[in-house]
Amino acid sequence: MLEPNADHRAAVAQAAGVAASRITLTVMLDEWAGADARRRAVADTVCALATGCASLAAAIAEGPLAGDLARTLSSGEAGEGQKALDVISNDIVIGALKAAPVAAVASEENDAPVLLDPTAPLLVAIDPLDGSSNIDTDISVGTIFAVFPRPEGADASEPSAFLQNGRDMLAAGYVIYGPHTAMMLTLGAGTWHFALDRAGLFRLVDAEVKVKEGAAEFAINMSNYHHWDVPVRDYVDDCLAGKKGPRERDFNMRWVASMVADAHRIFQRGGIYLYPGDGRKGYTHGRLRLLYEAFPVAFLMEQASGSATDGRGAILDLSATGLHQRVPFIFGSRDEVARVSRYHLEPNGHGERSPLFARRGLFI
């Protein structure tokens, strides 16, 4: 094996020094929380999640050396195959939250809330491993979470405790496990970007994340084109028409089948993500979960000057009606999200059903 030369060693040392000089997540949270009891509880919960996600990053990095992490063990709550790594991820994050002031956890991997400390002030809704269909292909996966207050007098073991409005969230974020492990976090005053260092600490990359406008990228699963409602088709058709179409510019399409990966790209480059409801059985109201997928990503987007909608209004204006409720979900650059909303809301003869909700309409 070739020995690194002096220039290489110097570059590595410099990079390590730059990383070490960056403020840590723990310090940021301590400064934010101060002496406020609720903020302290939120900070402790986010720190616990960060610790769990750092452990999960190490487990994911083992890949096939740790066995067949992509093997299907059972059918989860959603009726989808529950992978071995789904179960491992769930155990890790819930285990980490046992040290936090959390009353209960609503996880994609559990039918009912997992009770931790019934008297604690907070609730956590979480997707421990978003994009698990990508495990065996070594494509980025992630963890998505939302922190809510426990309503006064609420039984945290009951799903009803979690059925809150999106504006009730106290914090939200995701961790993406890719070429490097990164976290996006909001506490309601902007969106912060952190990266995990080799010592297992999340260090600040950007405290003022902003979603760019004017990007010419959209993310949608084009294989479902013939199932979409007319407004969704029209939006995509206009993008695909390129410079000769009404948009007068060329667009690129992206689709990772891991919402965290698509969201992270949008935070870096702008653009839009669409997962509408469609005409297939089980897809009428979309596929993504409101509590632990749409709510937290929408919170992050809005705090970074982006936008998120179900096609009729802001995602964060919704109130959850079920622990695993599904919702059509569009998010990204504010200008593009507004355009898609106009395609659905303006009376221009687009289709016969309610926005994004397949042929039956939302309330039928």
UniProtKB/Swiss-Prot annotation:
UniProt keyword Metal-binding, yes or no: yes
Binding site for Mg(2+) 1: E108, D127, L129
Pathway(s) annotated for this protein in UniProt: Carbohydrate biosynthesis; gluconeogenesis
Keyword vocabulary terms for this entry: Carbohydrate metabolism, Cytoplasm, Hydrolase, Magnesium, Metal-binding
EC numbers: 3.1.3.11
Chief location of this protein within or outside the cell: cytoplasm
Cofactors (names): Mg(2+)
Gene Ontology CC: cytosol
Subcellular location: Cytoplasm
Reactions catalysed: beta-D-fructose 1,6-bisphosphate + H2O = beta-D-fructose 6-phosphate + phosphate
Pfam families with a match to the protein in the record: FBPase, FBPase_C
Cofactor note: Binds 2 magnesium ions per subunit.
One of the GO BP terms on file: fructose 6-phosphate metabolic process
GO terms of molecular function: fructose 1,6-bisphosphate 1-phosphatase activity; magnesium ion binding
Annotated signal peptide: none
Disulfide bridge positions per record: none
Top-level enzyme category: hydrolase
Residues annotated to bind substrate: D130, G131, S132, S133, N221, Y273, L274, Y275
Alphabetized InterPro entries for the sequence: FBPase_C_dom, FBPase_class-1, FBPase_N, FBPtase, Fructose_bisphosphatase_AS
Positions of Mg(2+) 2 binding: D127, D130, E293
Subunit structure: Homotetramer.
HAMAP family according to UniProt: FBPase_class1 (MF_01855)
NCBIfam families: PRK09293.1-3, PRK09293.1-4
Family the entry assigns: Belongs to the FBPase class 1 family.
Protein name: Fructose-1,6-bisphosphatase class 1
Source species of the chain: Xanthobacter flavus
